């Protein structure tokens, strides 16, 4: 009797172990994806999340992170995957000075090589150059004969008119942001004329005519929507900011299939997996302006936009 009970208990324990084991196989494929706190990042974060979930992963998405917090999460191993920008990595994370004239391909190669030494694998790039830009209403630029950032710098320095300027708080302090821009173009925004706020607040400020000059990103849909003037970066201050999935080497060692999965995503964008050209980069910016417009102008949710894109490009079933 004791032997029968012991056998029965052993069978129950074995079945329990099998059941738990099966559950662990699914649960073991757990990935944490992080994204920053603006529209484009919400969309790419959802794209990565939904695509990996479709391929059998359990994904936790950690949104709304500032650049330093996202990087800290990657370095601590709390976040496995993010989509970072080449210019941000080169100047902020790797603390290099950008040399004007380094193109999209060169900068990607430099970042990829150095990040490999830090334990991060940079996969195929998405050529969209979401670089910082300064914009104004077209009539303000026309009235003051402004075309380039050099023209704008001269207007600041002349002091004949107040140029109310609105930039993101992070941009106002980061090493590749406003302080370096002012030094490069040799101008200064008076403290009384400078406003800072959360990402997107500068666009709202310009839309409402609360400022004359606002910080934007190259893929912001609202620029085309309102026909705003974008100041030419005639002294080549801003480095390329191309979007690239970055994966922890440790998680890629465990799940090497992630590389092919995310490279499939990059391949759906203009020039994905190929060397960048100005034409391909411009096409990529246009694609992302449209995607961002679906959220910022059509008021769709980022997860809807991501799902729609993945289905339309055959990456997941509808």
What do these predicted ranges mean?
Residues 93-123, 210, 222-236:
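Ligand-binding "clamshell"
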Residues 17-31:
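Sec-dependent signal peptide cleavage junction
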Residues 172-176, 180-187, 263-318:
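An extracytoplasmic/periplasmic, membrane-proximal ligand-sensing/linker region
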Residues 30-64, 127-204, 300:
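Bilobed "Venus flytrap"/periplasmic-binding protein-like clamshell domains
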Residues 50-51, 68-80, 95, 179-184, ...:
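Short helices/loops that flank or line small-molecule/ion binding pockets
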Residues 63-67, 77-90, 107, 199, ...:
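Beta->alpha turn/N-cap motifs
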Residues 132-142, 241-256:
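A bilobed periplasmic-binding-protein/Venus flytrap-type ligand-binding module shared by bacterial periplasmic
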């Amino acid at each position: 009797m004791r032997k029968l009970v012991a056998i029965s208990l052993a069978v129950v324990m074995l079945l329990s172990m099998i059941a738990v084991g099966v559950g662990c196989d699914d649960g073991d494929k757990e990935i944490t994806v992080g994204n920053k706190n603006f529209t484009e990042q919400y969309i790419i974060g959802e794209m990565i999340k939904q695509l990996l979930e479709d391929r059998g992963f359990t994904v936790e998405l950690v949104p709304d992170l500032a650049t330093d917090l996202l990087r800290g999460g990657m370095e601590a191993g709390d976040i496995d995957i993010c989509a970072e920008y080449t210019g941000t990595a080169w100047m902020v994370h790797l603390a290099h000075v950008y040399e004007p004239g380094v193109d999209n391909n060169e900068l990607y190669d430099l970042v990829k090589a150095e990040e490999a030494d830090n334990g991060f694998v940079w996969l195929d790039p998405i050529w969209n150059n979401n670089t910082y830009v300064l914009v104004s209403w077209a009539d303000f630029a026309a009235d003051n004969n402004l075309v380039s950032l050099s023209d704008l710098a001269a207007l600041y320095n002349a002091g004949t008119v107040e140029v109310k300027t609105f930039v993101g708080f992070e941009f106002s302090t980061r090493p590749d942001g406003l302080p370096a821009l002012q030094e490069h173009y040799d101008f200064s925004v008076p403290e009384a004329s400078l406003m800072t706020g959360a990402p997107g607040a500068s666009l709202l400020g310009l839309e409402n005519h609360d400022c004359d000059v606002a910080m934007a990103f190259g893929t912001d849909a609202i620029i085309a929507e309102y026909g705003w003037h974008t100041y030419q970066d005639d002294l080549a201050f801003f480095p390329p900011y191309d979007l690239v999935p970055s994966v922890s080497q440790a998680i890629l060692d465990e799940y090497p299939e992630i590389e092919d999965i995310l490279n499939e995503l990059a391949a759906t964008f203009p020039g994905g997996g190929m060397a960048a050209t100005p034409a391909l980069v411009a096409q990529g910016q246009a694609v992302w302006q449209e995607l961002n417009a679906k959220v910022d102008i059509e008021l769709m949710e980022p997860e809807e936009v991501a799902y729609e894109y993945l289905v339309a490009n055959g990456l997941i079933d509808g």
